[in-house]
Amino acid sequence: MYREKAISQKEYEEAKAYDLKKDFLPTEQANVNTEGYLYYTVLDKAVEIVMDLDMKKAKVNRDDLDQVGLDQYEEQARREIQSQGYTIQSTIDQNIYNTMQTAVANYGYLLDDGTADVNGNTMIETGNILMDNATGRILGFIGGRNFDINQNNHAFNADRQVGSTIKPISVYGPAIDQGIIGSESRLANYPTTYADGREFVNSTNVDLNQFVTVRNALNWSFNIPVVHVNNELRKKMGDDNFSYNHYLSKMNYPASDAWAYESAPLGSVETNVVTQTNGFQALANKGKYQKAYMIEKITDNSGHVVYEHKDEGTQVYSPATASIMNDLLRSVVDSANTTKFKPTLAGLNPHLASADWVGKTGTTDEFKDSWLIVSTPTVTLSSWAGHDLPAPMTMTSGDNNGNYMANLANALYYANPELFGIGQKFELDPSVIKSKVSEFTGEKPGSITYNGAKFNTPGKTTISYYAKDGAPQSTYKFGIGGTDSNYASYWGNLAPRATTNNNNNKNNDNKKNDN
């Protein structure tokens, strides 16, 4: 301007001496904590998304890449996020997340039981997910007890055996969905062996040597009955891997030959906490799976939307099946046979305990893993607990996990009292078939002919919930599983003590209660 004579020499000298720095806008402190589970998890999820976008642009299939190729795309995605000034919007509710971190700091010690891993570490680790049932949004999570001590994210990155939490997802749910069982069907709970002759170890001796209902089998998490149901499911559907092929694969469970093993219903297959939480989300969402997600939107530095989450969901179970499973899983929590979660919660917060809680526990061999997953109509909250390096815990590990989870849920309630949808209920879907059945057989009451003798089904009647077809007519071999001697024992020991005059019931099984 001076050379163009637009300003005088005096003005030019004054301008040169002026400190321009004082007019610069101050650098804003980014509201990002770059140390911790949250930062690294959000970044990793964003990198996965950008990788997929880049591969799509290049018309490259992820499955066709070797590890070197995947590493190259990952590095490219990380550079792209930084160089393009991407803004990542996550689903995490900061208040919820902070509350969960405070809760694990305050109550994580409840998990400790004095056991140690091979390195002498006595801290019992945990991974927790809080998921919105309707959308699959991850509202908050706990990656571990202390990031400074252990950076392994136990909610997302640690695959562990799932134990009995898989039973509703892979066996009872599909069997109800296919009309093979109803809520009060009878299942053999007699000592037995695997097909290869190995002795079968049950989870408890409660109600052994009899036929138990589906509801009671879940309440006590019996092992023998669920294997019988799974074998019947595989036989009737003509597919040893039916549950995975038609249910689990739709919910992104990891593919494994082990799903076809006879012992698969006991939870020997490994997966992570977020995947298992997602399975229960589907049941709590009327059978509709919404894939868990943490990234809502990614925009570049010009405001252009690079990615936005969209998911129409997948109907995995029928609404009838999901509602029956929730009715059964409510009994699991209310009975407190396998978890003290609800009684503990009632002592901490009776109002929160009045929410409609459903859920399932799980333990693995030598108590190396302890699981508890609970849902209300609005959210699903999960917990895995165990040593970072797999090692046995004590038999109290399940109670410890239930105690910890009750305190975690209570803390979340005070952070957001609307979170758990207190007052909302899991209702039976209108399509559920309500069959009047004999308590003795779990099938429709009526006359039975065996060895030339004709007699009526003994005992009282009850209602069994079916998603398909309704209860069959009672037969001598009424249950799922069991040998000839098991049936002879059951009929011989129990039938004489039951009332055999069921004429008042015989006329009811043809009424339209099975609709």
Features from the language model and the residues they span:
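Second-shell loop/turn segments in exported
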Residues: Y2, L25-A30, S83-T91, N153-Q161, ...
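Periplasmic/cell-envelope proteins involved in peptidoglycan metabolism and beta-lactam response
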Residues: Y2-A30, R79-F156, T165-P168, G182
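Conserved catalytic neighborhood of penicillin-recognizing serine enzymes
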Residues: E28-A30, I181-Y244, Y261, N301-S331
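Mid-domain, small-residue-enriched loop/turn segments at the edges of structured enzyme/sensor domains
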Residues: E199-V201, R234-F280
